[in-house]
Amino acid sequence: MHYRFISLALGAALAVSWHHSAHAANEVSPVQFIDTFAKIFGEHKGERKGHAKGVCFIGEFQGNSKLAAYSASPLLSGEVYPMIGRFSMPGGNPHAAENSRIPRGFAAQIQLSNGDLQHFALLSTPVFGAKNPASFLGLLQASIPDSITGKPDLKKIAAYRQAHPDTQGQADYLAKQAPPASYGHAAYFGLHTFYLSNASGKQQAVRWQLQPLDGIKGLTESEIAAPPHNFLEARLRERLAKGPLKFKFELVLAAEGYPLLDPSQAWPSQSKVLDAGEFRITQSDGDQCKNINFDPNVLASGITASDDPILQIRSAAYAISFGKRLTGQ
């Protein structure tokens, strides 16, 4: 019950690690996040510090070659590229309950023919759990279990959210939406702003997202209320036995006045959306993704990261987590 509450209280926020940057609010250190995750979830040596529970997959990506007006990146050339990825549960618990009200994660590494790598790290929530690293760290610290009861202080968390309203939107979304019934029945959102450049150097701010061609489907209330159990990996294998699992890759275009650097705010529903390609997952077994850290700041040529402080702080913490994992910490 403790892990299930923490997952609901923090939602997808617990899925994200950080990269230290001069832009990071109040000079928050990525080490603080790694240490705080351990205080919440405990030490799990050799495991990822975020998204500890998950399963690898392999497949391919093909971008839409008709978007030259927006991007000259080879990612969108129309060429088919190999992909290694990972579906996951957020947080640092490798035994997280799969029927709890927490999002799913989708991460992928695409190998381009010119040698470029493109990483994606997405969640099944359209907003992040805080507007900047300092606000998010405070939420985490407010959620550390009490040393006597072993449970989080609900009043403390509620008071923090009231004082920091940017932390409430994601929690509200998770409380209202049924958890995805499978990894293939969820939409996934990149949350952060990136910039595309065309051949003339003109830039366009975008957020990316994935739409499942199998459709969106949530768990039933009885499934959510059932005792914690595992089913996501088995459902994925069963689905792939029938053929590739496909996701439509979309680019949401920013317009004037959009919050480019605050992932806790959704963009307007009437935003222009481009069909940018397709992710096709063909197999899910093995450990091909084990040594990939899926840093979302690893980008193909023609694509650049924004100054979103949460995006910018992710690389360093991903690297710290990766180093700890490889050394059995």
Name what the model sees in each region.
Residues 1-8:
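Bacterial N-terminal signal peptides that target proteins for export
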Residues 9-17:
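Bacterial N-terminal signal peptides
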Residues 25-329:
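Active-site-adjacent core segments of small-molecule enzymes
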